[in-house]
Amino acid sequence: TNSKEGEFIAEGGGVR
């Protein structure tokens, strides 16, 4: 799972 800038997604995405 990807994430937008500043957002956090625990599902393999994380902070970008």
From Swiss-Prot:
Primary site of residence: secreted
Task: Please tell me one Gene Ontology term that the record gives under cellular component.
Answer: extracellular region
Q: Does the keyword Zinc apply?
A: no
Subcellular location per UniProt equals: Secreted
PTM annotation (Phosphoserine): residues: S3
Highest rank taxon of the organism: Eukaryota
**UniProt KW keywords:** Adaptive immunity, Blood coagulation, Coiled coil, Disulfide bond, Hemostasis, Immunity, Innate immunity, Phosphoprotein, Secreted
Query: Which GO biological process annotations does it have?
Result: adaptive immune response; blood coagulation; innate immune response
What does its PTM field state? Conversion of fibrinogen to fibrin is triggered by thrombin, which cleaves fibrinopeptides A and B from alpha and beta chains, and thus exposes the N-terminal polymerization sites responsible for the formation of the soft clot. The soft clot is converted into the hard clot by factor XIIIA which catalyzes the epsilon-(gamma-glutamyl)lysine cross-linking between gamma chains (stronger) and between alpha chains (weaker) of different monomers. Forms F13A-mediated cross-links between a glutamine and the epsilon-amino group of a lysine residue, forming fibronectin-fibrinogen heteropolymers.
Q: What does it do?
A: Cleaved by the protease thrombin to yield monomers which, together with fibrinogen beta (FGB) and fibrinogen gamma (FGG), polymerize to form an insoluble fibrin matrix. Fibrin has a major function in hemostasis as one of the primary components of blood clots. In addition, functions during the early stages of wound repair to stabilize the lesion and guide cell migration during re-epithelialization. Was originally thought to be essential for platelet aggregation, based on in vitro studies using anticoagulated blood.
Assembly, in brief, is:
Heterohexamer; disulfide linked. Contains 2 sets of 3 non-identical chains (alpha, beta and gamma). The 2 heterotrimers are in head to head conformation with the N-termini in a small central domain.
Q: What is known of its domains?
A: A long coiled coil structure formed by 3 polypeptide chains connects the central nodule to the C-terminal domains (distal nodules). The long C-terminal ends of the alpha chains fold back, contributing a fourth strand to the coiled coil structure.
Q: Per its record, how is this protein called by name?
A: Fibrinogen alpha chain
User: Gene encoding this chain?
Assistant: FGA
